[in-house]
Every structure is written in structure tokens, then in C-alpha cells.
């Protein structure tokens, strides 16, 4: 009970601040200590020499979208030639992406990481009413807004379910220079559904058993997704499972029924880098390759050795870091 009270106090503290509106962004003045240590909890699993300088902290900003406010963490760099938008997956949030955002900043990117609707600190009228299509629209709209505000080249990095969101954003906007993803899960595939879900029946029968009448029920992701396979590091898996984020059943149902706007055979929006963990027990490489191998655009595959679904293990995390540097160099025209 005490931890619940402390958590509530922490979030109330986070939501205090002064709004400063610039274009369609609302910037809040907040102290990093209000983040309740979530960022550092995830950073702790990076190899020591890859952890950022303690002085590197994200800035909290807010973007008005569909009557709500999307929380976006940023590492501004006015001298950066390339910007990177990082997109989390189901059950994730910006703080969970901080280790990868910090590595991207270290490779020269200006970085932004949104909390997608219903997760993290973003504010929506009803989290239980959020559908997968809202996430697709949100990421695409954010790409458009960011490109309108800043013409620098933009790369979208998608982790887990965020991989398909990055793909959709590039296909829908035509404004992305490249996408980098850790996996590409097409939920139309029974094999993909079996790997996504905690229960085998999800792969066999899929969305029809998740009837709309229960769409508004909110459940922790750990109860429906195979989150015990998040990492091969027990401590990291425990951290993720304990993270109190939950999504509506309607979100899962609409995700399982989703169809990409552009089939991979017709996707030519930008090059695609698949940076796939080599020891991913949740979504093995074969699942992603069913979609990736069909993509018409120039594409690159890198298997991250000994890395799990949340890829922080050596040597995979170093390979990912090098790949980010290579992508930056390529997009910047070096």
C-alpha cells in the first residue's frame, strides 16, 4: 500500500508545472526527479560503458492531439544533422525506451520519444477506448507535425510492436528518410499471434474470441502478452512485468485485426533496417522475416548476437549502437 501511495504522489508531482505553448507543442517545466527513477531502472541493464553521462536527461514536452495531450521526451540538438523518433511497443512507454534514446543521442541524433495514447504520461479521455488504429494515426500525425516544425531528415526507430508502427508511419506520410526496427510482427499470421500472446488459443483463434463487448476492460499487458520472454536477464524481465501499465482489451482486439495500409511488396517509402535480437524468445527472427523478406524497398538485416527481445545484452547492444551510427552517417549523406 505504501508503494501505491508513493507512486500516486509521484505522478501528481509530475503533472504539476507551467505550460509554454510553441506551435502545437506544450512544453512543461519539470524536474527530472519527478520521473520516479523509471529511466534509471532501465539504464541499469546497459553495459557500464554504454550508459550516458548522468547529465544527459530528456526534456518533457506535450503535444496536443485529438483533444488530449501526448507526452514526448526529447533530447534537443540544434547541431544534429538527423533526428530520430523512437516508438515503443505494447505495454511500453518513453522511459522504457530511454536506454536506446540515449544511445541514439550519443550517435549524433536529436531524439524524441512519445508516450503513445493510453500509456506513460500521455493524457486521453479514456484509456480503455484507445484502439490500435489510434496508435497508427498518432505516430503518423506526429511525423507530419515534426516535419512541419523542423525540416531535418527524420528516422523512425520502432521497438517490438513499434516496428510495425514505424513501417505504417513511413508508408502513410512519405516523410521518413529511413526506419529501423527490432521486429516486424504481422498479426495476420497465426505464427505471429502465437508468439505475441501468452496463451496458445490466441494464435489459433485470434481476435474473434475477444468480443467488442469487453473492449473497455483494462488489463495489464503481462496477463495477455508473453512478457516473461521480454529478456534473458531475469532482473530486467521482473522490472518490465512490475511496470504498472495496462491496455484495453479493445486495443489488443483491434491490433490482431489490423492490416497495413501498404503491403510489403508495394512498400517503397524508404530503406528499412531490421536490427533483430538473435536470442529473442518472444518474437524469433523467423516471425519478422515473413514480413521483412517481402519488402520492396532497400533493406538491411542485422542479427544482434545474444540479444533478447529488449536488446541490452553484449555483444548485441554494441552491434545495435554501431548500426545507429551507420544509419546516421547514411542519412546525413556522409
Predicted regions and their residues:
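An N-terminal hydrophobic leader/cap segment in hydrolases
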Residues: 8-64, 68-75
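Active-site glycine-rich loops that stabilize anionic/oxyanionic intermediates
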Residues: 89-92, 278
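Catalytic nucleophile-loop/oxyanion-hole region of alpha/beta-hydrolase
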Residues: 91-96, 120-151
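Conserved alpha/beta-hydrolase
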Residues: 94, 101-125
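Alpha/beta-hydrolase-fold enzymes
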Residues: 159-245
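Short beta-strand/loop motif that positions the catalytic acidic residue
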Residues: 268, 274-276, 280
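Short alpha-helix in the alpha/beta-hydrolase fold that links the catalytic acid
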Residues: 270, 284-293
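Catalytic active-site module of serine/aspartate enzymes centered on a nucleophile-bearing elbow/loop
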Residues: 298-334
Amino acid at each position: 500500500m505504501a508503494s501505491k501511495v508513493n507512486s500516486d504522489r509521484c505522478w501528481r508531482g509530475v503533472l504539476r508545472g507551467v505550460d509554454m505553448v510553441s506551435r502545437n507543442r506544450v512544453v512543461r517545466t519539470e524536474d527530472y526527479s519527478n520521473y520516479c527513477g523509471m529511466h534509471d531502472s532501465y539504464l541499469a541493464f546497459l553495459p557500464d560503458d554504454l550508459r550516458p553521462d548522468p547529465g544527459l536527461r530528456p526534456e518533457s514536452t506535450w503535444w496536443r492531439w485529438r483533444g488530449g495531450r501526448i507526452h514526448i521526451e526529447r533530447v534537443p540538438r540544434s547541431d544534429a544533422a538527423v533526428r530520430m523518433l523512437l516508438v515503443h511497443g505494447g505495454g511500453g512507454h518513453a522511459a522504457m525506451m530511454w536506454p536506446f534514446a540515449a544511445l541514439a543521442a550519443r550517435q549524433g541524433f536529436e531524439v524524441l520519444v512519445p508516450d503513445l495514447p493510453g500509456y506513460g504520461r500521455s493524457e486521453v479521455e479514456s484509456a480503455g477506448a484507445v484502439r490500435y488504429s489510434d496508435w497508427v494515426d498518432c505516430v503518423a500525425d506526429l511525423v507530419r507535425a515534426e516535419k512541419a516544425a523542423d525540416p531535418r531528415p527524420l528516422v523512425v526507430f520502432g521497438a517490438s510492436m513499434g516496428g510495425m508502427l514505424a513501417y505504417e508511419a513511413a508508408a502513410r506520410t512519405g516523410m521518413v528518410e529511413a526506419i529501423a526496427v527490432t521486429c516486424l510482427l504481422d498479426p495476420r499470421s497465426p505464427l505471429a499471434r502465437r508468439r505475441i500472446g501468452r496463451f496458445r488459443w490466441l494464435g489459433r483463434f485470434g481476435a474473434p474470441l475477444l468480443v467488442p463487448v469487453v473492449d473497455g476492460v483494462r488489463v495489464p499487458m503481462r496477463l495477455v502478452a508473453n512478457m516473461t520472454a521480454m529478456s534473458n536477464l531475469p532482473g530486467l524481465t521482473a522490472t518490465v512485468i512490475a511496470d504498472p501499465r495496462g491496455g484495453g482489451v479493445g486495443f489488443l482486439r483491434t491490433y490482431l485485426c489490423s492490416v497495413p495500409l501498404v503491403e510489403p511488396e508495394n512498400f517503397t517509402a524508404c530503406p528499412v533496417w531490421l536490427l533483430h535480437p538473435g536470442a529473442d524468445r518472444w518474437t524469433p527472427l523467423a516471425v519478422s522475416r515473413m514480413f521483412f523478406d517481402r519488402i520492396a524497398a532497400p533493406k538491411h538485416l542485422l542479427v544482434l548476437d545474444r540479444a533478447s527481445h529488449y536488446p541490452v545484452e553484449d555483444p548485441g547492444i554494441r552491434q545495435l549502437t554501431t548500426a545507429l551510427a551507420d544509419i546516421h552517417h547514411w542519412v546525413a549523406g556522409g
